[in-house]
C-alpha cells in the first residue's frame, strides 16, 4: 500500500495575504455560524462552509490570486449529493474580487453578497446530475457542518 500523499506547505506569501484579512473572515464566519477551513487540501484558499436547510452543502471560497498577490477572488458553490445514485448537482459562481489594499468592509460586502445569493438559490437552480462517483464515505460531511 502506498503511503498517503503529503500536501505541499502553503507558501509564506499566501499565509501573509490571509493573515491580513483573517479578522474580517473570522468575524464574518462567527456572525453567520460558518465553519472556516483554511487551505483545505493544500489550496491557496479559505472556505466558509455550512449545510443548507434546503439540502446539501454550500461554501463561500476566498482564493488567493497568485498572479497579483493583492487580489482575492470570492466565489460561491452549493451542491446536493444523491448518495443512492452516487451523483452530485451543483451551482457555482464568482461573486467578485477583493483588493487587499481597500477597506475590509469591501470584503465583508462581497462575503455578504455571496451568502445572500446562496440563500436565494433553490433546487431548480442546480445544474444536472454528474457522476456516478466512487463509493461515498459512510457519513456525509454535511452532518458536522453548521446548518443555515
Model-derived features with residue positions:
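Surface-exposed charge patches
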Residues: 27
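Short aromatic/hydrophobic-glycine micro-motifs
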Residues: 30-35
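Intrinsically disordered, low-complexity regulatory regions enriched in serine/threonine/proline
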Residues: 2-24, 36-148
Amino acid at each position: 500500500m502506498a503511503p498517503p500523499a503529503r500536501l505541499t506547505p502553503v507558501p509564506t506569501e499566501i499565509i501573509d495575504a490571509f493573515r491580513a484579512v483573517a479578522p474580517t473572515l473570522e468575524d464574518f464566519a462567527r456572525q453567520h455560524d460558518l465553519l472556516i477551513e483554511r487551505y483545505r487540501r493544500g489550496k491557496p484558499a479559505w472556505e466558509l462552509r455550512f449545510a443548507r436547510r434546503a439540502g446539501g452543502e454550500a461554501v463561500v471560497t476566498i482564493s488567493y490570486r497568485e498572479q497579483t498577490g493583492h487580489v482575492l477572488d470570492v466565489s460561491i458553490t452549493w451542491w446536493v449529493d444523491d448518495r443512492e445514485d452516487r451523483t452530485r448537482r451543483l451551482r457555482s459562481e464568482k461573486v467578485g474580487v477583493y483588493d487587499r489594499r481597500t477597506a475590509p468592509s469591501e470584503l465583508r460586502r462581497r462575503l455578504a453578497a455571496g451568502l445572500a445569493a446562496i440563500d436565494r438559490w433553490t433546487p431548480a437552480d442546480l445544474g444536472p446530475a454528474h457522476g456516478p462517483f466512487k463509493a461515498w464515505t459512510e457519513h456525509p460531511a454535511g452532518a458536522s457542518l453548521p446548518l443555515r
